[in-house]
A protein has these predicted regions:
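Catalytic phosphate/metal-binding cores of nucleic-acid and nucleotide-processing enzymes, i.e., regions
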Residues: 2-153
């Protein structure tokens, strides 16, 4: 039960952070994620936001110890890898893993129709103004923490 509550609190905290970051962008950023008109944060700000999210979640759950930096590093690698898999996946990658490539989907196709997007879609639908990359980052953080909690407790 404790593990479940910790996981929920991490997701809720991450969702709040995602909403706050989303408030600084245009209201229509996520209406059409694949649209050329959609605005994105510069790479430097995106990386900074990722680091802040990882540090906040690590400090909130582990306190200020050396394990905090270790978990932050693990989460950074995890969310960066997840982001690459979701958004920069080539046509040659297997469809069963991530669904059709994003640039080959029709307008009516959902961006969240694969198992890997379940957590991200929940956060994104809850916070309509939050950019999808935040939801993807939170998905990766949640995945790492679920593994961490599972093997720790």
């Amino acid at each position: 039960m404790f593990e479940f509550m910790v996981t929920l609190s991490i997701l809720a905290f991450g969702s709040l952070v995602g909403f706050l970051f989303g408030e600084f962008e245009s209201d229509r950023v996520t209406q059409s994620f694949h649209s050329p008109k959609s605005k994105k944060l510069p790479h430097g700000k995106l990386l900074t936001a990722r680091i802040i999210i990882c540090l906040l979640v690590s400090c909130a759950t582990l306190g200020y110890t050396r394990d905090t930096l270790l978990m932050t590093a693990v989460m950074m690698v995890s969310l960066t890898t997840t982001h690459r898999l979701i958004f920069n996946r080539g046509v040659g990658k297997p469809y069963w893993y991530m669904g059709p490539p994003l640039d080959h989907r029709d307008k009516d196709d959902s961006k969240y129709d694969t198992a890997m997007h379940l957590i991200a879609s929940g956060l994104h639908l809850f916070n309509r103004k939050a950019p999808f990359w935040i939801a993807a980052s939170l998905e990766a953080i949640a995945a790492v923490w679920l593994l961490y909690i599972f093997f720790t407790f």
